[in-house]
Amino acid sequence: MTADRPALRTGDGETRLSFGSNLSSFTEYLRGHAPELLPENRIGHRSHSTRGGDGMESGDLAPHGTTIVALTYKGGVLLAGDRRATQGNLIASRDVEKVYVTDEYSAAGIAGTAGIAIELVRLFAVELEHYEKIEGVQLTFDGKANRLASMVRGNLGAAMQGLAVVPLLVGYDLDADDEAHAGRIVSYDVVGGRYEERAGYHAVGSGSLFAKSALKKIYSPDSDEETALRAAIESLYDAADDDSATGGPDLTRGIYPTAVTITQAGAVHVSEETTSELARRIVAERTEEGGSAR
């Protein structure tokens, strides 16, 4: 149990902040003291229309991140994402980072409005670090999932204007009974509902339908890390093959999917050398097969 602490006071004796349940939440602290810094409040609001002056929907005015996939494997879990961001029918960026380590045993991928999503995930990482510093212990994985759900729910106003954020959270559950199956995947909807994905794999974003269809055929819950990573990259390749908003491996520019693996040893960014080698191998194999999957 956290010990009771006295309130902080300013020089004139005015009580400014009472240590309590909200102090361990950096997001709630911002909401009370600087709400304009929250991701959902850093956009302009339209009172009557969701269209901009050029007739574009508000959701098309900002770059959107697209496809993220997650897989559990024996002893861990991984998260991978493509690099493309789109703005309407245009490619806004070819090398966006969509996969982030949020603490030692968790990572989050983003789909939706890129600017808001990136700020939200970075704030989530600060939230976890802040909690650990204040309370002296890490949040459990369920606690992390609930915190992120609350933050996504806070973006509902922006989502109603077409600026939705849909993260995908993965982590290694230190409280799991079976270390071989301690990897966990949690998905969210735009109103902050959280859903445990127990199939062992999941995908979000515009290419998620194609990525999940690919994973359904090649995923194995008892695969090792390298096999799972290959499956993730291959599913992103299949998603890019059918979804114009998902970027496949770009051999010309040297742009490849990014990935994070999480095991009992912690979260690690997969090196570009590893992802590029796997991507090139997959492209070569598909070329030999005339573009078809094996």
Swiss-Prot record:
Keyword Protease: yes
Classification via PROSITE patterns: PROTEASOME_BETA_2
The enzyme's E.C. designation: 3.4.25.1
Keywords: Autocatalytic cleavage, Cytoplasm, Hydrolase, Protease, Proteasome, Threonine protease, Zymogen
Catalytically driven reaction(s): Cleavage of peptide bonds with very broad specificity
GO cellular component: cytoplasm; proteasome core complex, beta-subunit complex
Gene Ontology molecular function terms on file: threonine-type endopeptidase activity
Subcellular location: Cytoplasm
Record-linked CDD domains: proteasome_protease_HslV (cd01906)
Pfam annotation, one family: Proteasome
Top EC class, one word: hydrolase
Pathway(s) the chain acts in: Protein degradation; proteasomal Pup-dependent pathway
InterPro entries: Ntn_hydrolases_N, Proteasome_sua/b, Proteasome_suB-type, PSB_actinobac
PANTHER family found in the cross-reference section: ATP-DEPENDENT PROTEASE SUBUNIT HSLV, METALLOPROTEASE TLDD
Purpose: Component of the proteasome core, a large protease complex with broad specificity involved in protein degradation.
Protein name in the entry: Proteasome subunit beta
Organism: Rhodococcus jostii (strain RHA1)
